Amino acid sequence: MNQSILKIVLVALLLPSFGDIEKEYIQSIPGTKEKVEMVFIPGGTFTMGSEKSEQGHFGDEGPQHQVEINPFWMGKFEITWDLYDLFVARDIDRKRPQQLNGKEVDIDIDGVSGATQPYTEMSFGMGVEGYPAICMTQLAAVKFCEWLSAMTGNFYRLPTEAEWEYACRAGTKTAYSFGDDPADLDIYAWHEGNSGGAYHQVGQKKPNPWGLY
């Protein structure tokens, strides 16, 4: 699996736990216009990692081994600043439903476990609206998922490494989900050669066979 496709990271990948309904759904965020589009990922078994002979192979991609994955949902796009900034500001927390699925929801936090304002403007002037949230720590991404779970009443988390690769492969066995030819990468992803040294709004390229961007 060529690692060029794995550079879209952070809080993009979320998992709800409200039943195996095999279809896409849209998660609305109470009190806002924001939403998260979710894609159903069917369960299955795949070969994780890549062969040493594969172009672009990294040493940590082996040895190859079989992994069984249960069905789950994954975000169609990366999480954008539009939503992540709401988590950091916490201004909409009071608008969340007081009860969800018959259970009290508590997202009270302290100064350690809550989000903290970044030390600099993290988009670095490249754009915010519709752009993927970047440069947070893994802990911040985990806390975002906890916040989103409390706000919506559905369980969200980051994907495991195996779930991430499985979803990126989308049932294929080639270096990329679209084949082995890196010349086609421009159609599906931004990278050093076509990004102009900046990041871009989500959903601007073609999705993989399972509908993930």
Kindly give the residue locations of the regions a language model identified.
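Active-site microenvironments of metalloenzymes and redox enzymes
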Residues: 48-57, 68-178, 187
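Short, well-ordered junction/capping motifs at the entry into regular secondary structure
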Residues: 187-213
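Active-site/binding-pocket entry motifs
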Residues: 45-54, 182, 191-196
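Hydrophobic h-region of N-terminal signal peptides that target proteins for export
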Residues: 11-19
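Sec-dependent signal peptide recognition
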Residues: 2-11
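GGW-centered surface loops in extracellular recognition modules
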Residues: 21-40
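Short loop/turn microsegments at loop-to-beta-strand junctions
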Residues: 36, 154-155, 207-211
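Short, polar loop/linker segments at the starts of domains and inter-domain junctions
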Residues: 27-29, 48-69, 198-206
